[in-house]
């Protein structure tokens, strides 16, 4: 039986941002050159903020609270930290018809499918990137963010799903540039679901196979320290 070319790796502990970014860029280049397999890489970061290509300076409300990193992904400011599952998705879209819209829809379906395994009805919203859930009083909260970049038709960056992060840490930014008080952030824990990261990863893996197809397990990347 031929093994799938997409690898699935999970890094333990907290992964520093800059070595992770350097690895992603190198791996994406190797995939584009036909020298490496595609990869879905799951990790957690220490508390930090990242700025996408559309980030506005005024949306960084507490610039000294956590480290801030400029990144080439799409989107605005977001928070990463413990209790949030980040998945960096390095896929060759040339092998998938170079259909960016379909790729983003598949990422959305992946996250919606993972949430559904915990009884959470999540969905997308017109004009607002990511995956959202309805709350009381007409509120809607984001449970997962999407921000990707393409280089030579290979994706990198990816998604961030709030399992049980400290939601107060989002207060140092205007998340994704949305200041309307009707729209906030939430997590599995905030919605009343106590889920450890290993169990969430199992749900994420199953939802991936439904949205994208099979993967094979791989060792966590070895990173070059800062």
UniProtKB/Swiss-Prot annotation:
Its main location: cytoplasm. SUPFAM superfamilies: Class II aaRS and biotin synthetases. Residues 34-216 form the BPL/LPL catalytic domain. The record marks 142 as: Lowers pKa of active site Cys. Keywords: Acyltransferase, Cytoplasm, Transferase. The active site is at 176 (acyl-thioester intermediate). Belongs to the LipB family. This is Octanoyltransferase. It comes from Maricaulis maris (strain MCS10). The gene is lipB.
């Amino acid at each position: 039986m031929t093994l799938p070319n997409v690898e699935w790796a999970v890094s333990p502990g907290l992964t520093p941002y800059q070595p992770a970014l350097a690895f992603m860029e190198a791996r994406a280049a190797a995939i584009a050159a036909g020298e490496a397999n595609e990869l879905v890489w799951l990790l957690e970061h220490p508390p930090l903020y990242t700025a996408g290509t559309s980030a506005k300076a005024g949306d960084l409300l507490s610039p000294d609270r956590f480290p801030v990193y400029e990144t080439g992904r799409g989107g605005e400011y977001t928070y990463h930290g413990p209790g949030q599952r980040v998945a960096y998705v390095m896929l060759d879209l040339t092998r998938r018809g170079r259909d960016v819209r379909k790729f983003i829809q598949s990422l959305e379906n992946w996250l919606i499918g993972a949430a559904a395994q915990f009884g959470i009805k999540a969905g997308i919203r017109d004009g607002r990137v990511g995956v959202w859930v309805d709350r009381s009083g007409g509120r809607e909260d984001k449970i997962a963010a999407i921000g990707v970049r393409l280089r030579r038709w290979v994706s990198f960056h990816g998604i961030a799903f709030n399992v049980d992060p400290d939601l107060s840490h989002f207060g140092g930014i205007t998340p994704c540039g949305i200041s309307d008080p009707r729209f906030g952030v939430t997590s599995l824990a905030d919605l009343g679901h106590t889920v450890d990261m290993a169990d969430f990863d199992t749900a994420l893996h199953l939802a991936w196979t439904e949205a994208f197809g099979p993967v094979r397990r791989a060792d966590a990347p070895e990173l070059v320290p800062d």
